[in-house]
Design a protein with these regions (language model features):
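Structural alpha/beta surface segment adjacent to cysteine/selenocysteine redox centers
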Residues: 1-84, 164-182
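C-terminal cap of thioredoxin/glutaredoxin-like
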Residues: 1-2, 69-72, 76-182
């Protein structure tokens, strides 16, 4: 299985769809943090929430783009922020990340117009595909959003017809019976 990582700006998705992120809803914020910590512990994954969240990930996303979004680069950035719980969102924190990663020209890389354009285009393409959250896996124009969809995605990889049953097709056109007033 070839997994291609594509950095996007989550805030761009939220703005487009008119949604709040889970950390912007007070009751959901704590629940989400605790679940992530519990899940990581259960699966032996190093995990520590950074000093503040939500935070602006723009520099880290641009750095990933500038370094071709390899699994190694994304792993390094992800581990720094979420494995070690370090700050990469302040100027000092980002500088420390680039020192530890031995990327002396990071500020020049992330200032590049082409890097900024790629991140913007990635986000616009995600919106065009109908992506509304992260992580999302896109397989043959079929989207699987979130960790809880991993088993469904794996099932789909084994048997793409899992989503073509009569009931699955009916669900794609299910009407609404009520709408909230906003």
């Amino acid at each position: 299985l070839d997994v291609r990582l594509v950095p996007i700006l989550f805030a761009g998705l939220l703005n487009h769809w008119g949604q709040k992120g889970p950390a912007e809803i007070p009751a959901k914020r704590t629940d989400t943090y605790q679940y992530c910590h519990w899940y990581a512990t259960q699966h032996g994954i190093p995990f520590k929430t950074p000093p503040a969240h939500p935070f602006n990930p723009l520099n880290s996303l641009r750095l990933a783009v500038a370094l071709n979004t390899t699994h190694e680069v994304v792993g390094l950035i992800f581990n720094y922020i979420w494995g070690e719980g370090k700050d990469a969102y302040t100027e000092e924190g980002f500088h420390q990340l680039t020192l530890e990663a031995n990327i002396p020209n990071a500020n020049d890389l992330i200032a590049s117009t082409s890097v900024k354009n790629v991140l913007r285009q990635n986000t616009e393409q995600a919106i065009t595909l109908g992506i509304y959250g992260v992580p999302t896996f896109a397989i043959n124009n079929t989207l699987f959003w979130g960790l809880d969809r991993t088993d469904m995605m794996l099932d789909y990889l084994e048997n793409p017809n899992v989503l073509t049953t009569n009931e699955m097709q009916r669900l794609t056109t299910l009407p609404t019976a009520a709408e909230r007033r906003l």
